Every structure is written in C-alpha cells, then in structure tokens.
Amino acid sequence: MTDSSGWPGAFFWITMVSVVILNTANGIYQNSVFGMAAKLPPKYTGAVVLGANLSGTFTALLSFFSEYMAPNIRTAAIYYFITALFILLACFDTYFALPINRFYRYSELLHQKAASKRQLENKATGKQDTPPYWKIFRQCFPQLFNTFFVFFVTLALFPNVHSDIQSSDPHFVISGKYYATVMCFLTFNTTALIGSSIASLVQWPSKKYLVIPVVWRVLYIPLFLFCNYQPKDIARVLPVYINNDWVYFVIAVTMGVSSGYFSSVSMMYCPRMVESQHSATAGMFGAASLITGIFTGIMFSMVMPSLVANVSLGLS
C-alpha cells in the first residue's frame, strides 16, 4: 500500500477523478443493462434490480465478516479489493457470454425483426425512423415517477440516517459495535433482496394504482427521524418518540422490503407502458429515473441533521 500522507492534495484529486470516472462508467453500464433487459420478459428487468440488491447484501455480509475477522482496516481493505477483482472478472465473462445464450439471441432476433418491420413501414409512409422520445417519456411517466420516488425516499434514509440511529437499549441482543452494520446495512440489503424476489412472483397493485403505496412510503422519513437518530456533531432537539429497538427493526424491515418490491415492480411495468419496439428506450428512461432518485435522495438526506437539530414538535 502507498503512504499518501506526504501528498494529501494530489491524493484527494486523484480520488475525486477516480470516483467521477467510476460512477460515469457505472451509470452508462447500468442504463445499458436495463435497456437490454427491457427487450426480454418483464421478470428479467426485476432480476436486474434483484441483482443490485443481492450485491448490497453481499457487501454488507463482507463488511460484517471483515470487521469481525480482520485484525485491522488495511487487511480488510485487501479482502475487499480481492473480492471486487474476482466479481469484476465474473461480470466481464458474463458480458461476453450473454450473446451466446440461445434465449437472449432469440429475444434479440424478435426485437430486430420488429425494428426492421417498423423501418419498412416508416419508409413506405415517409415517416422519420427515430424513436419518439417525448411520446415514450409521456407514456412511461407514471412508472418513471414511481421509480424515482421509491429511490428518493429510500436514499433519503439509507444509509445516512439509517446508519446514525443508535440503540435505545444497552442490553439489546446486538452489541453497539455491530449495531449499525446489522440493523442498517445487513437488514436493509437483505430485506430489499426479499422484496425484489417477491416482485418476480407477484406484481401488485396494477400500473394505475402503484403510485398510491409508493407515495405513502414518504411516511418512513418522519418515522426514522422519530427513532434514536443521533447524527454526528449535532445536538438533537427533536424528541425521540420511538425508543424501542424492536419497533425500529420492524420499521427498517418494512422499509427495505417495500423498497425492493416497489422499485422492481415499477421498473418491470415501465417497458410495458409502450409498444414493444420502444421497450429498450423505456427501460433506459427507467434507469435514468432510478439514478435521478438516488442522487436527489442522497442530496435530501443532508437536510436530516438540520431537521432534528432545529425542529421540536412538542408532542407529549
């Protein structure tokens, strides 16, 4: 490992540039994957979301075991790097293996035939052969909003607020050292994985009414703030109304399950809102809404410490 204590400024900018490059590449990759999955039956779009939640669960487990087994942070970092390298190689292999898959080639062939037929029809009628992006956006907008709002609420709470909630009972079954790791990261990622798995079996409610439970999820924001949320270097003014660790655990579980479930369902509904030849474009719009929801949710989470430091409801 390199000692960067002698050049902190250069290290900072190298880190920032690396983060920008990595996240830009991740955004392009994620958008492309959702576009590819949108050409397949809806359950495959749900499988992409499920895979994202599975990676979160795997990371949370890795964090827990490295914290438990690694003697120091440097050793834990080596474990993380080696694991990430193997997973990256596996993903690289599957990327090149996908076109060999017979089912994917069959679905791609159907999509190409539909596109060729549309091109011939447009050529005969003199229409421009470009996707009607605005029309696709308007048709998908209800599900785009659902996707955005699910991730907005989730990322407004996880991990910034979620990880700063402290135990209210010193004798709780999970010790203070592992409290945030288990109650926040492991609980959320595992329950989100369960929610995504349920969505692959059952999609409810319908496209028209999905917005109702999605909007109701905004109530998780005050519920989490009412728990024993103690942001660092902030004097909390808002009273702690939920001081039972088991109640907090139930709230965290339902938040995680609903996040995984409704995000999967909304992403699965999105390509169904348009004609089959536009499903890939609709999937990419859905991925853009997902990323936008994540970004705005993270930005909004920065307001939470100020809320508990300046707002006192005065409820008895």
Residues of each region from the PLM?
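Interfacial helix-cap and linker-helix signal at transmembrane-aqueous boundaries
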Residues: S66-N72, I165-Q166, V202-Q203, M304-V308
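Membrane-interfacial loop- and helix-cap regions that link adjacent transmembrane helices
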Residues: M1-S18, A97-L98, R102-V265, Y269, ...
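Extracellular/lumenal N-termini and interhelical loops of multi-pass eukaryotic membrane proteins
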Residues: V311-S316
